[in-house]
């Protein structure tokens, strides 16, 4: 019975659940020893194994094992050794091997190792003497694999009680592992490249086998270290010995033959075979890793350049499909082999002469090092370019060129120093893309014209070049690619873009483009919205609206259309506005888009210029009031059709309505809004139209027409198409977005790409992981994706949230899908939302294209490298604890941030923030910083001049003696201040001239403070006070003129007892909410006379407050005839009920 049987028996024993963890560790230790012994014994046919006592120590160890088993259980042990009995049977027969006896056996092993390690040395037997038929590259690699597998076991053990725990030597063992892996790859590389018989290179394979066996024997003899009482060598001495063994590359294998001589010989032979080995590829990152690992440092600038290029080559080859370099394999083989010859030759020259110069190297090798590096540069550039291109996102937005041009202007202004050496090239590229913009516009608006195929091909090429430009500029700013490579890359992009433009011109598509653009803009009647040709739905709605526009009342009428986002109200309005049968009935047509944030003057300019048919430049210096008067006079005698799109508030309509005179000539205004209240407010005669959802057949017709144009969908794809249309949940904008993505895919491959995985909302079928899914993975909720897409930012690959927690947990827990490892492969990820599914302990700083990132994080600080995400516009990080999260000052280098949400964060270095960081001019929402002092808040406000919404905690640990006015940005509209406990008075007055929403929580307040503060808040519409103490008198007096615009007042958990309100203090108040105001005596009687009041809610308050609320209701409804008024009483405070009972 051999040792292998014992090993097999031990492995099967590990399956027995009756063994304790200590027992299993003991068995694993024995297995570890036996695996090494087995491998050493396989080398018995080689003379070097006998010469260096490798066989002797192995045979002795086997005898120790045999004698130990026989001494413990003589009868059963013999049967076990012969293979007739299992270890499990031994256990069941209660012939137990105690831990003490095995502990003694371990000490015997250790002493035996010490005895042999004192005599062990590198074998001196010549390489020629070890040439035997058994040594093949496959055999060498198998031996190295066993050594690597066994050493990996030691590296991974972190349990201090384990017999294989060796913490002091892990670093050295990892070095040994790296040497063995690189040696194994070198063997594979040579064997894979040679066409000639492998036996011709046995010297190299023998050397590799001896080297691997020697270093493995050295490790085995010194590890694992037994208890300190039995250890002759200190851990530091063992570490030094292992380090010496790792440095074997500088030792001679035998007199006159060094390791480098052997490598040089095999590489020179290999170089001769390259022309005949064109079908075998050398483009593997492993061989480049070997060369990089072997580099000597400090010889010259040229050697530093060579090292840099080899590192770049290695890093990019990892991500490169070999098919993309099939025509350059011979060149790459030559480059890699030449680099290897150069590096290993340097060692020999360096060893013979201490003060080696560059001239010595060139003369000795016959090289001109600077000139020889040039071909390597060419290959490095080619590999980097191909590695980028093969990872380009396959969703190509035709609006991406607009996005790029905006970014280029932004780059040149913001990073002028970094881009100085590329300035001329970037300006040329910018000019070329501006010339091509009209062509792309036609591709978007006329996808089915006579140049359809050519236009699509050219457009895709242009967009790919745009991606490359962005990547190159980013790399320049981040210094990720050397300058020589960037310059060459941009020059190639210029030449390729010029070729694309020439191809377009050759087919006269540029002339057609210009004619089309002129036609589109020359006449109001020809104004066709982008989605006009897809109006295949809402036929009943269109007919209804057409009738309202052309018939009905003689007076002016407003046709209001309202719906949720994405239903197509803007497209529908544009369809009516550009309908010839409608437009021909009006003298003047004009339109404007209001949106949530608008400029009154810009709206007037847009309407006036449409009305008079002139450009806006000549009127830009005119005051807004004069423009409004000019527009009114222009419209007064004429019948007009006005389109006012995307109105968010009543006030926006109030700004414009005075410009539209009513002279009973059937003038019409089309108004679109998301809000029913706005639509109702703007209506005159006609009732607002609430736009319905799509019917299923309308969804399919839109998708089919958008994707296939005038063609019909093939039967093969129709089933997939119907399912896609259904999953878009009857939203036109969803359908158009999905259709645009499908157009960018090859239609024939839509089914096999499993495109449904992109958009399926409620359920995702678990599938095996594959490269194809990796490329297109998008776990997304369509609403959120749509909201992001319509904001104007390009969405590339998306890894988004999903509402099937079980699926995501299994997805993220599997070994092939570790989130931290897979994310770097999505190089072009723009949107990443992990907030609801997984807690992460890292920030994906290797994704520079991210625009949106949301996650739940475990750590208490953010790394400074987060500034690598310099394109980020939205950052949402939520912690798993209530501790303050430290934010590095480098966040202030992320100048594109518009939305920053990190609960309870504090700047890490306030001084650096003040002195060095730029302003975040684009930041509009900031939530939730923690400020210990008022001065900290002032500092943050100076760095964020354009805030519109701020939520923060101000602890105010240091208080000034008098009120301090804290000036907020002029644009600020929403402000929420809170503290954890109402222990002190708020130490500052709030000055925010345009503030509309204010919430204060956790402070002492008094009438004086509130009076002084509200003097700075004349536009306040919503005031909410939570957990507020009202000082010793518990009184709040509100005088006239303090809250002229307040509409909503909410008071919750206040200590307020006496509330005195002047008659006109809240002239337009609509809602009053009182929660848990148990000490308040009553609601002031002046609320009976507020005619705008619509709603009062009382919860957890005493009977007197409820009684006063009912009195107000009676007066409002009966006396004031306020039919819209509503009183809601949830419950009376519990102690009032007990007292009354």
Curated annotation (Swiss-Prot):
UniProt-listed CDD domains: RX-CC_like
Q: Gene3D superfamilies this protein is in?
A: Helical domain of apoptotic protease-activating factors, P-loop containing nucleotide triphosphate hydrolases, Ribonuclease Inhibitor
> Cellular location of this protein?
Cytoplasm; Membrane
User: Does tRNA processing show up as a keyword for this record?
Assistant: no
What Gene Ontology molecular-function terms does this entry list? ADP binding; ATP binding
Q: Which residues form a coiled coil?
A: 417-437
Q: What does the UniProt function comment say about this protein? A: Confers resistance to late blight (Phytophthora infestans) races carrying the avirulence gene Avr1. Resistance proteins guard the plant against pathogens that contain an appropriate avirulence protein via an indirect interaction with this avirulence protein. That triggers a defense system including the hypersensitive response, which restricts the pathogen growth.
- What's the protein called, per UniProt? Putative late blight resistance protein homolog R1B-13
- Its encoding gene is what? R1B-13
């Amino acid at each position: 019975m051999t040792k292998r049987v014992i090993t097999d028996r031990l492995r099967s024993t590990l399956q027995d659940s009756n063994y304790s963890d200590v027992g299993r560790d003991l068995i694993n230790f024995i297995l570890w020893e036996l695996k090494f012994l087995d491998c050493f014994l396989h080398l018995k046919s080689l003379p070097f194994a006998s010469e260096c006592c490798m066989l002797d120590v192995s045979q002795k160890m086997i005898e120790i094992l045999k004698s130990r088993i026989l001494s413990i259980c003589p009868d059963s042990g013999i049967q076990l050794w012969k293979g007739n009995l299992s270890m499990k049977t031994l256990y069941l027969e209660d012939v137990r091997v105690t831990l003490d006896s095995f502990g003694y056996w371990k000490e015997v092993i250790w002493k035996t190792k010490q005895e042999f390690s004192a005599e062990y040395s590198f074998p001196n037997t010549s390489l020629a003497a070890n040439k035997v038929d058994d040594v093949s590259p496959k055999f060498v690699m198998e031996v190295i694999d066993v050594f690597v597998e066994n050493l990996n076991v030691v590296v991974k053990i972190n349990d201090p009680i384990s017999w294989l725990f060796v913490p002091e030597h892990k670093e050295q063992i990892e070095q040994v592992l790296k040497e063995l892996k690189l040696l194994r790859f070198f063997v594979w590389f040579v064997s894979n490249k040679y066409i000639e018989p492998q036996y011709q290179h046995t010297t190299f394979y023998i050397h590799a086998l001896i080297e691997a066996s020697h270093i493995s024997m050295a490790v085995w003899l010194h590890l694992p270290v037994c208890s300190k009482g039995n250890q002759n060598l200190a851990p530091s001495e063992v570490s030094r010995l292992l380090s010496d063994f790792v440095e074997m590359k500088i030792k001679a294998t035998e007199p006159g033959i060094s390791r480098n001589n052997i490598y040089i010989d095999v590489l020179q032979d290999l170089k001769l075979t390259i022309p005949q080995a064109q079908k075998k590829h050398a483009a593997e990152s492993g061989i480049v890793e070997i060369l990089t690992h072997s580099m000597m440092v400090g010889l010259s600038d040229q050697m530093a350049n060579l090292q840099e290029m080899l590192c770049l080559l290695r890093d990019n080859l990892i991500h490169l499909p070999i098919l993309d370099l099939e025509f350059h394999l011979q060149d790459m083989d030559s480059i890699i082999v030449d680099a290897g010859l150069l590096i290993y030759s340097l060692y020999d020259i360096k060893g013979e002469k201490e003060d080696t110069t560059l001239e010595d190297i060139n003369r000795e090798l016959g090289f001109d090092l600077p000139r020889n590096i040039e071909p390597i540069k060419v290959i490095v550039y080619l590999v980097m370019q191909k590695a980028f291109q093969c990872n380009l996102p396959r969703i190509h937005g035709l609006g991406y060129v607009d996005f790029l041009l905006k970014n280029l202007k932004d780059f040149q202004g913001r990073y002028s120093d970094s881009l100085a050496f590329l300035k001329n090239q970037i300006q040329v590229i910018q000019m070329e893309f501006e010339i091509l913009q009209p062509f792309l516009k036609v591709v978007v608006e006329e996808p089915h014209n006579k140049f359809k195929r050519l236009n699509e091909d050219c457009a895709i090429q242009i967009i790919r070049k745009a991606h490359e430009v962005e990547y190159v500029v980013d790399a320049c700013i981040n210094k990720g690619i050397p300058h020589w490579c960037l310059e060459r890359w941009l020059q190639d992009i210029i030449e390729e873009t010029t070729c694309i433009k020439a191809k377009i011109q050759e087919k006269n598509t540029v002339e057609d483009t210009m004619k089309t653009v002129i036609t589109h803009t020359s006449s109001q009647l020809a104004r066709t919205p982008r989605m006009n040709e897809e109006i295949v739905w809402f036929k009943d709605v269109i007919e209804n609206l057409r009738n309202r526009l052309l018939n009905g009342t003689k007076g002016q009428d407003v046709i209001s259309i309202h719906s949720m986002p994405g239903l197509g109200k803007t497209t529908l309005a544009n369809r009516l506005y550009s309908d010839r049968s409608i437009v021909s009935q009006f003298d003047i047509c004009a339109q404007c888009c209001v949106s949530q944030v608008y400029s009154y003057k810009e709206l007037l300019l847009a309407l006036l210029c449409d009305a008079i048919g002139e450009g806006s430049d000549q009127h830009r210096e005119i005051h807004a009031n004069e423009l409004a008067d000019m527009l009114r006079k222009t419209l007064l005698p004429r019948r007009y059709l006005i389109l006012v799109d995307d109105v968010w508030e009543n006030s926006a309509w109030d700004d414009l309505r005075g410009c539209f005179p009513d002279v009973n000539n059937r003038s019409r205004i089309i108004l679109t809004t998301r809000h029913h209240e706005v639509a109702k407010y703007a209506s005159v005669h006609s009732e607002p139209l609430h736009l319905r959802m799509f019917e299923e057949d309308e969804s399919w017709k839109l998708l089919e027409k958008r994707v296939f144009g005038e063609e019909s969908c093939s039967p093969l794809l129709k089933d997939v198409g119907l399912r896609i249309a259904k999953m878009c949940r009857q939203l036109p904008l969803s359908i158009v977005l999905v259709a645009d993505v499908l157009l960018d895919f090859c239609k024939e491959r839509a089914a096999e790409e499993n495109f449904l995985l992109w958009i399926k909302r409620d359920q995702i079928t678990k599938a095996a992981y594959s490269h194809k899914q990796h490329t297109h993975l998008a776990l997304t909720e369509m609403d959120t994706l749509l909201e992001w897409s319509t904001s104007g930012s390009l969405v590339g690959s998306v890894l988004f949230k999903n509402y099937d927690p079980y699926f995501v947990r299994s997805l993220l827990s599997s070994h092939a899908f570790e989130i931290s490892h897979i994310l770097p492969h999505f190089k072009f990820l723009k949107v990443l939302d992990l907030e609801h599914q997984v807690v992460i302990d890292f920030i994906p700083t290797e994704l520079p294209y991210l625009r949106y990132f949301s996650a739940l994080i475990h750590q208490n600080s953010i790394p400074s490298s987060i500034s690598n995400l310099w394109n980020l516009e939205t950052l949402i990080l939520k912690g798993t604890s209530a501790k303050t999260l430290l934010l590095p000052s480098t966040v202030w280098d992320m100048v594109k941030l518009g939305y920053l949400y990190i609960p309870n964060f504090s700047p890490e270095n306030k001084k650096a923030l003040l002195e060095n960081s730029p302003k975040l001019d684009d930041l509009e929402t900031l939530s939730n910083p923690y400020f210990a002092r008022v001065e900290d808040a002032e500092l943050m406000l100076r760095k964020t001049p354009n805030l519109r919404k701020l939520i923060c905690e101000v602890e105010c640990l240091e208080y000034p003696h008098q009120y301090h006015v804290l000036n907020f940005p002029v644009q600020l509209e929403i402000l929420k201040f809170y503290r954890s406990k109402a222990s002190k008075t708020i130490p500052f007055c709030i000055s925010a001239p345009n503030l509309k929403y204010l919430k204060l929580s956790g402070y002492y307040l008094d009438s004086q403070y509130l009076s002084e503060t509200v003097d700075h808040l004349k536009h306040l519409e919503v005031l909410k006070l939570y957990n507020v103490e009202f000082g010793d008198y518990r009184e709040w007096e509100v005088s006239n003129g303090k809250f002229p615009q307040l509409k909503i007042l909410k008071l919750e958990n206040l200590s307020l007892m006496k509330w005195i309100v002047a008659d006109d203090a809240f002239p337009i108040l609509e809602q009053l909410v009182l929660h848990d105001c148990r000490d308040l005596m009553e609601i002031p009687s002046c609320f009976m006379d507020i005619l705008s009041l619509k709603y009062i809610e009382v919860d957890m308050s005493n009977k007197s407050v409820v009684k006063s609320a009912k009195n107000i209701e009676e007066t409002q409804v009966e006396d004031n005839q306020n039919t819209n008024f509503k009183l809601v009483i949830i419950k009376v405070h519990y102690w009032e009920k007990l007292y009354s009972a």
